[in-house]
Each structure stands twice: as structure tokens, then as C-alpha cells.
Amino acid sequence: MRKFIFGIILGAALLCGMKARAQYNREYFFWMGRSSMMNNDYQEAIRTLNTLLRFDEDAFEGYFLRGIAKYNLDDLLGAEADFSTAIRLNPVYTQAYTYRAITRSRLGNYDDALQDFREAIDLRPDLPGPYYSRGVTRLLNQQFKEAIDDFDKFIRQENKVADAFICRGLSYLHLKDTVRAYDNFNTAIRTNRENPGGYNRRGGLYMEQKRFAEAEADFNKAIECDSAYLLSYFNRALVYSDTNRPMLALADFDKVIQLDSTNSLTYFNRAMLRTQIGDYNRALDDYDKVALYSPNNVLVYYNRAGVYAQLGELEKAIDDYSSAIKLYPDFANAYIYRGRLRELLRDPQGAKKDRDTAQKKIAEYRSRLSDSTYSIYADTTQRFDRLLSFDSKFSGGSFDRITGHNGGHEEMRLLPLFKFTLMRPDTVPTVERYHVQRVEDFRKRVDNEYL
């Protein structure tokens, strides 16, 4: 009997010990998962949290942390699913609503994102964070007045966050209120003089207003604050290009590519700049990179065709014009230039066909101008915008990037494809053909229209 009682007591003690050990392990896995995330080791964090969730399927915080790790690895759908599970297990989990909203904003699902922000704010109207994040989402969704209202509410509680002033300044800028935009960018700089974002945004506004010296000074300051801040190098390169300093511009584009070797927009701008200074072979190398990283961009093939033509590689130029036409069949200029090259390659029928097609496309375009509703442009414009897009992001995928340091779109632009100079008629240099009399005599003897 004593042995039986002792066995029961021993079994109970072991069960208690196992329960205590399981509880200890649960906290251990949480701690290990958080530690891995603090060290930016998100894959290890996911492995650790997977182990936790296998033993405790109701650990809503585990799903929440795993969602953050997935977000930082750009697994946005997986992150959204984990945040949704956390909310299902704990319907009043404010942070889960906030971060699911941010994830949905990244996915372009603005309506559901704004609904999640409403839930978070209804649960905790005293927290400033959701107002800021909702303001960023509204800024991305082009609801600029509503975004300003959210940033106002955030700033009333947190007036030492420079990024809030930057985002509010961007909202005013989109409303064409440059005075308030400048005021907010200046406040952001005064709030945190070590934050490159304020200098970069103000410099961008200076650049748009052709105040290049002030823009350059701001971009220099932004780079001084953060020597790895890509957008400042990129924007300063645009200033150098606009002020006819191509070698300095190339050096800054080189720096951007050194820091981000897959940035197709930077390769494209560097290719155009190299073309302008006659460095055609290296321009081709850059266009090849753009075609690799943004294969559906119509301008890549169109511009590269022009470089091939300059180098006398007419067949390759025709192939690129054909690629541009395949992507955008209404591209009249591509037909025109392909037709000219076909003439040079003794293909008069192909050349005539391209000329006729180009004239037809131009006539169709002109006829559309009479459509006062512009409805006929709706699909074509959106499609052409996609054909001009580049697979480039200067911002990363972390929560800091979307809710902190960058706050909205990082605006990048192309170098101008053409530059024009207005001159008086008597100062315009006349174009003089190289004249050799023997060549002229030969042309007359042969009497062929293709010479």
C-alpha cells in the first residue's frame, strides 16, 4: 500500500515537473524568437516560433511575432495570414490590427488596411502610432487631406518625430501647397538634424523649382548624415546632370549601383548619360542590366536600339525596335525608326510597311484627341504606365521603413530623354555635310535613290 501511494505521489510530481518545464520552454521560445528578430535573423526567428506554435496553437503573440518576421522577409501574404490568426485568437489585439493594416497597405489593399486602422483606433484611441501609420496609408492612397488630419493627431501627441513632419510636408506638396511643404520639411530638419530624410525631401523640392545650388547643398548634407542613403546620391546625380556636370553625375550613379546592384532605374539613367557623352559600349552594358531586371519596360529596348544604330549594329537595333513594338504595338516612333533601318538594309517592302503602320498609328492618335471625355485613353494610359515602370525600390521591407524612416513613396525620376536650347537664328550653327567631289560624281553616275 505504501509503495502504491508513493507511486501516485511520484507520478504527480513528475507531471507537475513536466508542466513547469513546458511553461518554461514556452517563455524560452518567445525569448529566443524575439532575440533572433532583434538580431535581424528573421529565418531563425520563424523556425523558433514554428516550434512554439506546434506545442501551443493558441499562442496569439507567437503568430504576431512570426508575422513581423515574415513581413521583414517580404512574405507579405504569410505575414497577413499570421496577423489574421493572432486577431482571431485575440480580437482586441490592437498591435495585430495595426501591423496587418500596414501589410495590407504594402499589398495595395488600402480599403481593408484603412478598416484595420479604424479597428485599432477604436480599441485604443489614445495610441499615437496608428494615426501615423494610417496617415502614411492615406498618403499612398492619395487621400492627402485625410492624411494631413492623421499626421496632425499624431504630432499633437508626438511632436519630436521628424518623419511625421516629412510625411505631412509630402501631403501638402501633393496638394500644391509648397509653402507648407517647405515649412514641414524645415521643422523636420530642426527636430532631427541627423535624419537625412528632411534634407533629401527639401532638396527634392528645391530641385523641382530649379534651385539647384540649394538642392545640392541639401543632398550633400543628407549624405553627410547617412553615407549609405541611396536616394540622396541618386537625386544629387540628377542635379549634376541638370547643371551639365555629367562626370559627377556618373560618379553618383556608380555609388548607387555599388550600394544596390539591382536598381534598374539607376542603370537606365546612367545608360542615358553615357549615351549623351558618347560612351556607347558602356551604355549598352547598362541597358543590358535594365533589360535583365525590368524586362517588360518598353523604353529599354527603344533606347538600346538607338545605341545599336549609333554603333552600326543595325540588325540588333531592328530586333530591339521589334521588342518595343511587341510590348507596345501602338508605339509609332518605333515603327518609324525601324522603317528607316530597314531601308538601310535594302528591305524597301519592310520599310514601307513600317512607314504605313506608323502613319496609321499617328492618325488613330489624332482622331482620339477629338474624344473630349478621354475615356478612350483609360486602358492605354494605365498599360503604358506599366510598360514604363522599373522594378526598383529604394526603400526596404522592414517595419521601420514603412512606418518610420521613409514614410511613403520614395520618388525617383528619369533623366530627360531630350534637352532643347533656345537660340537666336543668327547664332544657330548651320549643318554642313562633308563634301567630296569624287563621291558626288559617283552618285550621279550610279543614279540610285538608295545612295
Describe these PLM feature segments.
Residues 38-39, 72, 106, 140, ...:
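Register position in tetratricopeptide repeats
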Residues 51-52, 85-86, 119-120, 153-154, ...:
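Canonical positions in the second alpha-helix
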Residues 55, 89, 123, 157-158, ...:
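Structural marker of alpha-solenoid helical repeat scaffolds
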Residues 303, 309-310, 326-451:
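Eukaryotic alpha-helical solenoid repeat scaffolds
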